[in-house]
């Protein structure tokens, strides 16, 4: 309500652009998803072990796995304080841990190293500009491999193909 521009991190597309256009997406903002209860139940609901970050990616992937699509409705407004989450070290730790968990819980095993590897590369490139949080990030990355992330429910190869055809292979 303050008139401040939407942070691009809340636009769930690789090519962010303007927030207004609606499109198929592969993650949802955890604060305001809207879907039929039957689809939510078929998708397995929220990924409770995450605690912070990536539950929305998992829910979106699993909705795609039910044969449905996930739509970002750019014309809807959800108000939330635009506070930089990187102000806390747990942001880095949980993002890294949960990326690994997301892959371990949902992807066919052969894709897990590609997904985690691509996000590791992205984080290393980001750290060239700003090393803040890199230690916490690697701590979370290691925890993701060491800890059990809860139940595994692999998405089907046909879902990987549908997501790829829709513009977002589950590798990035």
What are these regions (language model features)?
Residues 96-101, 106-110:
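Catalytic-core region of carbohydrate-active enzymes that cleave or remodel glycosidic bonds
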Residues 42-43, 53, 81, 102:
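Residues that scaffold the ATP/ADP-binding catalytic core of kinase and kinase-like folds
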Residues 94, 110-172:
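Non-catalytic, C-terminal membrane-associated alpha-helical segments of glycosyltransferases
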Residues 52-58:
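Acidic donor-binding loop at a coil-to-helix junction in glycosyltransferase catalytic cores
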Residues 37-38, 67, 105-107:
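Short loop segments at secondary-structure junctions
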Residues 1-45, 49-52:
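Acidic/His-rich active-site region of diverse nucleotide-sugar glycosyltransferases
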Residues 60, 66-90, 101-102:
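Active-site donor/metal-binding and catalytic loop motifs
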């Amino acid at each position: 309500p303050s008139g401040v521009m939407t942070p691009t991190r809340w636009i769930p597309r690789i090519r962010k652009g303007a927030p207004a256009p609606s499109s198929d997406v592969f993650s949802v903002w955890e604060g305001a998803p809207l879907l039929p209860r039957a689809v939510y139940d078929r998708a397995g609901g929220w990924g409770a072990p995450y605690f912070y970050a990536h539950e929305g990616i998992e829910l979106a992937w699993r909705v795609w796995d039910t044969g449905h699509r996930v739509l970002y409705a750019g014309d809807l407004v959800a108000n939330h304080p635009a506070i930089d989450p990187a102000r806390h070290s747990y942001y880095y730790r949980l993002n890294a841990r949960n990326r690994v968990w997301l892959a371990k819980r949902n992807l066919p095993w052969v894709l897990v190293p590609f997904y985690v590897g691509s996000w590791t590369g992205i984080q290393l490139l980001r750290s060239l500009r700003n090393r803040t949080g890199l230690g916490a990030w690697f701590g979370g990355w290691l925890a993701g491999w060491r800890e059990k992330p809860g139940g595994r429910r692999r998405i089907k190869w046909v879902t990987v193909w549908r997501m790829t055809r829709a513009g977002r292979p589950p590798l990035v």
